[in-house]
């Protein structure tokens, strides 16, 4: 790239934020393509050998990673194709935009998928968000990226995904691909153990998954597991790992119980229907000395967000391979272990925290005022105080609250919701506002953020081989209903930007 690193020693150090986000972008669509029970470590290294400062390299790296796995001896059900598309000022989706074209567009979206035997493309991963030009373009007549336009973008992406897959197949056909290894497949439990656990504890497992409160449900699960272990363990005394097998079988049956109730009865763990939201609350001005603060709670998920204002010298200097040199709007997300009732080291942000912070940052970016309208540096921090699913989307809601509490004239309030999916016997059941357990036992985590009129950010991960675009379109419509409900609750807490805090005024002037 023709750049000397900006660090003190002028040498590459650990992976920076952009590299971590690119790694996550690559990992997410590739992971479901490995066979069930495959536990061998696979290390895929993407090295940027050259960067022209015009074309993004992340999607190129994703396609390259898929191609590398396809021509290796690793069991991998590929290829996976990926494309970045942009919604232009003229209201068209264009593929593989340059950095400049992306900045001038209203919305960018990375879509990855696999080609099915019938020629269709199953979507495996989506990462999308509005740009700094979104609001101005919408004001000047560019069609807003709503659910319908986004669904059209998913359909449009299939053509270019197929082209990426075709290129990879050309590579596969041109080289001697070694035979795929037959790795040892880890079996979580023997059939006999599974049946013994089912006989001893199925009814108890089902009952434990009908307890709405997370702490009470967790205690009930531990009690049921202990009862099953006491009943079943003596039957397999000769098995070296009997305890582990029994615990794995209990988890598998728990997953079955949760999914069966959702598909057959339309009832979830906490008794909600598939479209129901948990209890909501929103509050601002929680910390008087903060420039802005917002507390958002959805069920047992609670996030406290802070906004801090600074002058230009507080901008973040960016030292990576992109053309961006500095950032005046930052969002940092912290997920301490106490938020899930656990202990652990707190040594700085992990990859997940960096990813969630970037998603929440992207969700608010289109509505943050430009430097000309608001000449301040903005740092937002989301502190997860309690977690039971969808803390990143709670961070989006908390961000809106704290920005308005700080007096930042955002273009419009933004809210976010996490959607889930259960697939069984050819039927897709979409869930609104998923719990942590529904994320773990379900087949999709689909996060959607936006205003009342348009979408500002979106992220999709799936454990399936892919999700039909029609199912995603329905999930988008369902998410909009939930988003509007969230915005109603937030509007009751604060309906317009407040006056700037005296603490902020004394600091910034």
Question: Language-model features: where?
Answer:
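Glycine-rich, flexible beta-strand/loop modules in the N-terminal catalytic cores of phosphate-handling
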Residues: 1-42, 48-55, 122, 127-142, ...
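Alpha/propeptide regions of enzymes that mature by internal proteolysis
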Residues: 9, 13-35, 39-46, 55-75, ...
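Conserved helix-loop functional segments at active or binding sites
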Residues: 28-36, 71, 311, 336-341, ...
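Flexible, glycine/charged-enriched surface loops at secondary-structure junctions
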Residues: 33-42, 77-79, 164-182, 215, ...
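Conserved phosphate/anionic-ligand binding catalytic regions in large, soluble enzymes, centered on
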Residues: 56-69, 73, 284-307, 389-408
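Mobile "lid/hinge" segments at catalytic clefts and subdomain interfaces of large enzymes
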Residues: 75-203, 406-496
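Noncatalytic alpha-helical scaffolds and linker/capping helices
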Residues: 189-287
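Conserved small/polar residues in nucleotide/adenosyl-binding loops
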Residues: 508-509
């Amino acid at each position: 790239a023709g750049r000397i690193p900006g660090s003190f020693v002028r040498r590459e150090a650990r992976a920076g934020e952009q590299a971590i986000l690119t790694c996550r972008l690559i990992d997410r669509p590739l992971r479901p393509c490995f066979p069930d029970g495959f536990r061998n470590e696979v290390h895929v290294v993407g090295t940027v050998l050259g960067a022209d400062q015009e074309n993004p390299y992340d999607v190129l790296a994703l396609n390259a990673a898929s191609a590398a796995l396809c021509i290796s001896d690793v069991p991998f059900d590929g290829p996976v194709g990926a494309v970045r598309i942009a919604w232009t000022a003229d209201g068209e989706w264009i593929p593989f935009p340059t950095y400049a074209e992306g900045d001038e567009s209203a919305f960018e979206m990375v879509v990855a998928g696999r080609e099915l035997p019938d020629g269709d493309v199953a979507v495996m991963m989506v990462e999308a968000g509005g740009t700094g030009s979104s609001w101005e373009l919408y004001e000047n007549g560019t069609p807003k990226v709503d659910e319908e336009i986004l669904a059209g973008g998913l359909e449009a992406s299939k053509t270019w995904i197929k082209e990426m897959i075709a290129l990879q197949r050309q590579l596969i056909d041109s080289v001697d691909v070694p035979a795929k290894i037959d790795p040892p497949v880890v079996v979580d439990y023997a059939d006999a153990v599974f049946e013994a656990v089912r006989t001893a504890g199925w009814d108890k497992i089902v009952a434990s998954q009908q307890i709405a409160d997370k702490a009470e449900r967790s205690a009930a699960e531990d009690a049921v597991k202990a009862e099953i272990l006491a009943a079943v363990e003596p039957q397999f005394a000769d098995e070296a790992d009997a305890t582990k097998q029994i615990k794995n079988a209990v988890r598998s049956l728990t997953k079955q119980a949760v999914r069966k109730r959702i598909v057959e009865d339309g009832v979830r763990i906490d008794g909600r229907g598939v479209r129901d939201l948990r209890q909501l609350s929103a509050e601002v001005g929680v910390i008087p000395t903060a420039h802005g603060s917002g507390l958002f709670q959805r069920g047992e998920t609670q996030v406290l967000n802070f906004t801090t204002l600074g002058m230009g010298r507080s901008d973040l200097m960016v030292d990576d391979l992109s053309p961006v040199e500095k950032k005046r709007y930052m969002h940092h997300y912290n997920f301490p272990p106490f938020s899930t009732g656990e202990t652990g080291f707190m040594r700085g942000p992990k990859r997940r925290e960096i990813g969630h912070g970037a998603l929440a940052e992207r969700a608010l970016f289109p509505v943050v005022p430009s430097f000309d309208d608001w000449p301040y540096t903005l740092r937002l921090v989301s502190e997860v105080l309690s977690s039971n699913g969808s803390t990143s989307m709670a961070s989006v809601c908390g961000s809106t609250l704290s920005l308005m509490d700080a007096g930042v004239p955002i273009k419009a309030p933004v809210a976010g919701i996490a959607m889930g999916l259960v697939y069984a016997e050819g039927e897709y059941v979409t869930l609104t506002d998923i719990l942590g357990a529904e994320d773990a036992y379900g087949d999709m985590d689909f996060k959607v953020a936006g205003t009342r009129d348009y979408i500002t950010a979106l992220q999709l991960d799936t454990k399936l081989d892919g999700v039909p675009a029609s199912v995603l379109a329905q999930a988008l419509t369902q998410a909009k209903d939930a988003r509007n409900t969230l915005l109603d609750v937030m509007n009751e807490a604060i309906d317009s930007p407040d006056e700037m805090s005296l603490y902020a005024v004394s600091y910034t002037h």
